[in-house]
């Protein structure tokens, strides 16, 4: 169908964000992230935060004055209480404005906003966020997962190690800063099994190392190890698929060291590396709205009564008719 703009709401975990997006640009956006006082994300507390602030951020984008042809929301994967909160808001908006409703896969949204912002066409995607570490590529109508973590996602691993060091959430950016000051590599477990990888053993070893070595050196070693594993499986996916583009997405993708390692690998293989602008790495309403725009164009809408959230929604469950 013909459509020009969609309002999207993101709220899978700590980020709460809304945006109105068209084919050409982001027309309006607002956010109000949940920041825990201590520790990591508490699902019920995050959901309470989202419930308290979702009307505020939606009102901010509505006050921009731009109309929209549909409403999209993050259907999953994510924290159930948070997903249900934003889904309720999206249903209410769709009914109030009498427009179609689209339930968006959060992982697919990271891919699509990256493709939109960089202009790449058919890349191997390294998707690295809190709970996810996946190597993905399009094949036979879907984004197929070629490899992934067998235990903990890279973002959660970094955040947990950050808390072990006494760093405030989120730990990833603070570990990146400390790693730039590190000079000595400390041996840590390196676990790649075919196309899959594992971080739990490496994290345990890093915690033990933190009691013996400078935290800057441990952060440096942790990053080098963890990112080398990701680059290895991404390079293997490039060889297997024969593609010549690599796109990075997800919050951890903003790490400049990881981007540098991927860019070097791509140059060595004659491939091109793509990274979207920094604002699109973290969870954001714009990626939900843009993917909702694609789904609306291809009639992937859902009735309100069938719009239940899915906390374990897999990337490869989604049909992709636009590629």
UniProtKB/Swiss-Prot annotation:
Predominant place of localization: cytoplasm
Listed name of the protein: tRNA N6-adenosine threonylcarbamoyltransferase
Similarity field: Belongs to the KAE1 / TsaD family.
GO-annotated biological processes: tRNA threonylcarbamoyladenosine modification
Binding site for substrate: 127-131, 159, 172, 176, 255
Reaction(s) catalysed (UniProt annotation): L-threonylcarbamoyladenylate + adenosine(37) in tRNA = N(6)-L-threonylcarbamoyladenosine(37) in tRNA + AMP + H(+)
Residues where Fe cation binds: 106, 110, 127, 283
Sorted UniProt keywords: Acyltransferase, Cytoplasm, Iron, Metal-binding, Transferase, tRNA processing
UniProt GO molecular function: iron ion binding; N(6)-L-threonylcarbamoyladenine synthase activity
